[in-house]
């Protein structure tokens, strides 16, 4: 079985090498014919696939110019159909020998490949099956793809490859591209929200001369010019608080954090945080603002407060606030206020089958461990845990 898998892997690699060789030969042929795609430095674009599809009545019959990557092709003699993916989605194009010329159509059929990038002009119409398409009158090869795209039209299937070859994942998966765009929109709206409330966005140091901040191991480097060991920051908190001390009443930072620790589905050594601090308010005031910010940003980015995340409906308009003790009482059935001593707390944990990390854990630590064991995975809807 293992031998067969190895043979299949070698066969796939040989096929990829052969396909890459063929594509380079096609490129050489195009260059020899004076059609070098890499000499095309720009292509004017005046529309995109999503706008055309969403406003067909306004675009029907009009000439538009688009650019994108060819994701499929159906050749039918003197006419063909392709799907072109641009930054907003995908649209079908209709290409004929009569419209783009015999020589260019011959190249389209024989020398152009799935994955190549084109610029094209044509008029918008609907096919007999009702699909919004573009009848191409001008087709220009802008870039030749020298490596074949993954076999699966619906995207990469190998999770490791998805993360190692993000550019391929973006090419093949529209949902991934949408996630990138939505992340950008979220950050934009968060900034707009905070800026509109008088917050000042700041950049605090990424390289520090000492290990400070959260209980996390930092990445260490060396500054050659100063002959000084330095550390990548593990949080932005302390520097932001110094700005509050310095008289800046409202500050926030969207910052990259680096922690030289383990990795799993919830932890990455490099990630982004948003921290904000405000003078002359309390944690209730910050809770109020954060809840309002989430609702405002969600409505602007998603158009609704009810969103679906991995098959689960999240209702951003309904927030719950619980103290940690209230949450443990609700989900574990034990009341923190009934524990007169640390021994009472440890006995409660034992009765629930929770093995404590520290045998002499105090009431507070027992409460935290019960929260981890019984509460955290049940908090699906927006919930603030405090006190």
Give the role of each language-model region.
Residues 2-12, 16, 27-33, 37-285, ...:
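Class II aminoacyl-tRNA synthetase-like tRNA-binding/catalytic domains
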Residues 212-218, 299-387:
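Metal-assisted phosphate- and nucleotidyl-transfer catalytic regions
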């Amino acid at each position: 079985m293992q031998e067969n898998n190895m043979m299949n892997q070698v066969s796939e690699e040989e096929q990829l090498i052969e396909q890459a060789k063929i594509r380079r030969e096609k490129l050489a042929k195009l260059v020899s014919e004076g059609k070098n795609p890499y000499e095309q430095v720009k292509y004017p674009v005046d529309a995109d696939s999503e706008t055309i599809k969403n406003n067909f009545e306004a675009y029907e019959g009009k000439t538009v110019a688009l650019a994108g990557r060819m994701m499929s092709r159906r050749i039918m003699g003197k006419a063909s159909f392709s799907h072109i993916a641009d930054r907003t989605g995908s649209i079908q194009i209709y290409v004929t020998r009569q419209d783009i010329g015999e020589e260019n159509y011959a190249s389209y059929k024989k020398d152009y490949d799935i994955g190549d990038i084109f610029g094209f002009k044509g008029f918008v119409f609907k096919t007999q099956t009702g699909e919004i398409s573009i009848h191409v009158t001008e087709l220009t090869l802008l870039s030749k793809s020298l490596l074949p795209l993954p076999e699966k039209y619906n995207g990469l299937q190998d999770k490791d490859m998805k993360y190692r070859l993000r550019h391929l994942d973006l090419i093949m998966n529209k949902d991934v591209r949408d996630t990138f765009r939505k992340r950008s929109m979220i950050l934009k709206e968060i900034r707009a929200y905070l800026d509109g409330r008088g917050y000042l966005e700041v950049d605090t140091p990424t390289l520090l001369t000492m290990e400070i901040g959260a209980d996390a191991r930092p990445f260490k480097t060396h500054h050659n010019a100063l002959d000084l060991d330095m550390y990548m920051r593990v949080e932005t908190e302390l520097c932001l608080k110094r700005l509050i001390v310095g008289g800046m009443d409202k500050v926030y930072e969207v910052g990259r954090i680096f922690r030289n620790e383990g990795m799993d589905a919830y932890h990455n050594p490099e990630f982004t945080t948003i921290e904000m601090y405000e003078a002359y308010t309390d944690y209730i005031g910050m809770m109020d603002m954060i809840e309002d910010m989430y609702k405002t940003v969600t409505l602007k980015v998603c158009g609704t407060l009810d969103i679906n995340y991995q098959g689960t409906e999240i209702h951003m308009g309904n927030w719950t606030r619980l103290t940690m003790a209230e949450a443990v009482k609700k989900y574990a059935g034990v009341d923190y206020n009934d524990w007169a001593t640390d021994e009472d707390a440890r006995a409660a944990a034992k009765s629930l089958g929770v093995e404590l990390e520290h045998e002499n854990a105090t009431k507070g630590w027992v409460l935290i461990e019960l929260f981890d064991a019984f509460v955290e995975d049940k908090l699906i809807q927006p919930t603030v845990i405090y006190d």
